Design a protein with these regions (language model features):
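General structural feature for long, well-ordered alpha-helical segments within catalytic domains
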Residues: 4, 8, 32-37, 41, ...
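Loop/helix-junction capping segments adjacent to catalytic residues or to phosphate/diphosphate-binding pockets
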Residues: 30-31, 56, 109, 194
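Phosphate-binding glycine-rich loops and their immediate beta-loop-alpha structural context
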Residues: 1-50, 55
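Residue-level recognition of alpha-helix initiation/capping sites
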Residues: 3, 57, 144-146
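Short alpha-helix boundary/capping motifs
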Residues: 1-2, 56, 69, 187
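Flexible glycine/proline-rich
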Residues: 65-214
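Short glycine-rich anion-binding loops that position phosphate/pyrophosphate groups of nucleotides
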Residues: 53-59, 103
Length: 214
């Protein structure tokens, strides 16, 4: 089961980078992972992306291994959903970074879209992308302290106004709703109740300047 690797690889043409598959490691391959990181730091690779083993479980060794290296920047855990356990680190004295993405498919997708992709834009010297707005078609309630990235369906009315409908099945392991979606709805922190008709920030699931209507 390596759907996350295939998904990221499928985006390589859209995001202007060459993808090299580093393979799959087992739960007990902590030492192998450490050796791979060291090898990648010494190579021409600019960005290391992992998927899984970043939470707080017994076999989630990625944070512990990454912290063994000399780092100039490190964070783990953000008040978002999906993707809360995401990890980022920059290695000292080399222009290389690592993103540790959560293992659930939707978490991987959201974190790539909202963390890895903006980083790529930055190193390419491209201006930060701005969301477009759409009217909410259904009420939504969430935790006030958390930013939510929601699988949604974008449509347009007869007079050309954009509308967004939040889909059922927002759990990070549910693929069907992700396949049925064509946009990410970003529901900001500091607010719990989002009412029908409210304008919501929207992002294409695979980057800007692409046709997101199906």
């Amino acid at each position: 089961r390596n759907s996350n690797s295939h998904y990221i690889k499928s985006l390589s043409n859209n995001f202007l980078f060459n993808f090299i598959d580093g393979g799959i490691l087992r739960d007990k391959d902590e030492k192998i992972f450490e050796k791979k990181i060291y090898k990648n730091i010494k190579s021409k690779i600019d960005i290391i992306i992992t998927s899984g083993a970043v939470s707080a479980g017994k076999h989630d060794f990625v944070p512990l291994v990454v912290k063994k290296f000399d780092l100039s920047n490190f964070f783990k855990g953000v008040s978002i959903r999906p993707g809360k356990p995401i990890l980022f680190a920059k290695f000292k004295n080399v222009e290389k970074v690592i993103f540790g993405l959560p293992g659930n498919p939707i978490s991987t997708s959201a974190c790539f879209r909202f963390f890895v992709y903006p980083y790529l834009l930055n190193i390419l010297g491209i201006k930060s992308e701005k969301p477009f707005k759409a009217k909410l078609k259904n009420n939504f309630f969430k935790n006030k302290k958390i930013i939510r990235f929601l699988k949604a369906r974008l449509t347009s009315t007869k007079d050309g106004k954009l509308e967004i409908q939040i889909l059922k099945g927002q759990e990070s392991y549910k693929i069907k709703s992700f396949v049925e979606s064509n946009v990410w709805g970003l529901f900001k922190d500091g607010q719990s109740n989002f009412k029908k008709g409210e304008l919501i920030d929207c992002y294409s699931p695979i980057g800007p300047n692409l046709n997101i209507f199906i």
